[in-house]
Amino acid sequence: IKTIIEDTYKLYGFYPLDTPIIEYSSVLLAKAGGETEKQIYRFNKGDNDLSLRFDLTVPLAKYVSARYNELSFPFKRYQIGKVFRGERPQKGRFREFYQCDIDVIGDGELSLMYDAEIPSIIYDIFTKMNIGKFVIRINSRKILNGFFENLNLSDKYQDILRIIDKMEKVSEEDLIDMLKEINLTN
């Protein structure tokens, strides 16, 4: 499974990155609320206040900050690694688990194409894993616009969204007719 995920991330141009599992607590708690403090495993080693990482994003931010002038942007990275939560275990929530993370970091505004690329990556991974039928639900018109941009359909964006909004209210035949009206078939 890990190989499938890594190979797919690489196929989309993501660079592998590994960050430390143990971090200074001050780094993990910087700009965080009280909820984060409840989530981390914290311990002292000598005079050092240390914690196990609770996600892969904070260590990534530290990495980018330390190497900002050395990186090429947009910086596309992936990491698959263990993270640890100090919260009480409950159904579907574990104290130690693997997180598969991909991020695109820019030094300015990023194209929506990067957001639109994420569901494509998920689709490719799930398909390669042969998990059977699945549905990817997207609740962002900005991301949807990225898909249309990728398909060279930006000019029909508003028309397509109006049709999508009617999907559950009209028959499949009516839906096809509406798509034909804006010259979208297949």
Predicted feature locations:
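Extended, charged alpha-beta segments that form solvent-exposed binding/catalytic grooves
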Residues: 1-186
